[in-house]
Amino acid sequence: MSGFQQHTGLVVPLDTANIDTDAIIPKQFLQKVNRIGFGKHLFHDWRFLDDAGQQPNPEFVMNAPRYKGASILLARENFGCGSSREHAPWALADYGIQVMIAPSFADIFYGNSINNQMVPVRLTEQEVDELFQFVEANEGAEITVDLEAMKVRANGKEYSFEIDEFRRHCLLNGLDNIGLTLQHADKISEFEAKIPSFLK
C-alpha cells in the first residue's frame, strides 16, 4: 500500500448524526470477501430509489453534481456506529473516499478505516460546524488534510487533530497488519529455521 501524507480534495457534506454501517453498506451486499466492488453500493438505500440501484435519488447529497468526485466525507457525530462489518470502510474506499471528518467515530469503524488506509479525522463539533458552513456555501470547496502535521486546512484556517502515533505511523507508511508483519520477515525466517524438524 502507498502511504498517506497529505491530501487535498473535494468535500461532500453528509449532515446526519449516528450513521450506522447498515446505512453505509446494507446487509444484502455483504456476500463478497474481497475489498473491490462495494463502492457502487455505498449508501445504497439513500442513493437510489429502487432496489436495483438504477434510479438515483435526486434528493441525496452525494448524487448532487457539485459533489461528484468527492474524496473527503464530512459527517456528524458517531459516524460508523452499528455492526462491526469491515465492508463499510471497503465501500467508502472503493467509492473514492480517502478522508472522513466528524466529531466522533464508532471505535471499531475507526480502527477498520485506518486498516484500510483511510484517515478518520476527529474535530470538535464547532469546527465541524464551520466546515459544513464553508462547504455548503462554496461549490467546489476543497479541504487539505495533512497527516504529517496533523492539520486540516480550509478557508484560510487551520484545525489541529490527534491520532495515536502507532496508527499515524501505519498510515504514513502504508502499513496494514500484513505489512507490519512483513517488516519482520527476516526475524520470522530466522526463528523458523531454529525450529527442530520434528516440530515442523
Curated annotation (Swiss-Prot):
It holds the Pfam family Aconitase_C. Keywords: Amino-acid biosynthesis, Branched-chain amino acid biosynthesis, Leucine biosynthesis, Lyase. One of its GO terms (cellular component) is 3-isopropylmalate dehydratase complex. CDD domains: IPMI_Swivel. GO terms for biological process: L-leucine biosynthetic process. One of its GO terms (molecular function) is 3-isopropylmalate dehydratase activity. Its EC number is 4.2.1.33. The keyword Amino-acid biosynthesis applies. InterPro entries: 3-IsopropMal_deHydase_ssu, Aconitase/3IPM_dehydase_swvl, AconitaseA/IPMdHydase_ssu_swvl, IPMI_Swivel, LeuD. The keyword GTP-binding does not apply. PANTHER family: 3-ISOPROPYLMALATE DEHYDRATASE SMALL SUBUNIT, 3-ISOPROPYLMALATE DEHYDRATASE SMALL SUBUNIT 2-RELATED-RELATED. Belongs to the LeuD family. LeuD type 1 subfamily. HAMAP family: LeuD_type1 (MF_01031). Heterodimer of LeuC and LeuD. Catalyzes the isomerization between 2-isopropylmalate and 3-isopropylmalate, via the formation of 2-isopropylmaleate. This is 3-isopropylmalate dehydratase small subunit. It comes from Vibrio atlanticus (strain LGP32) (Vibrio splendidus (strain Mel32)).
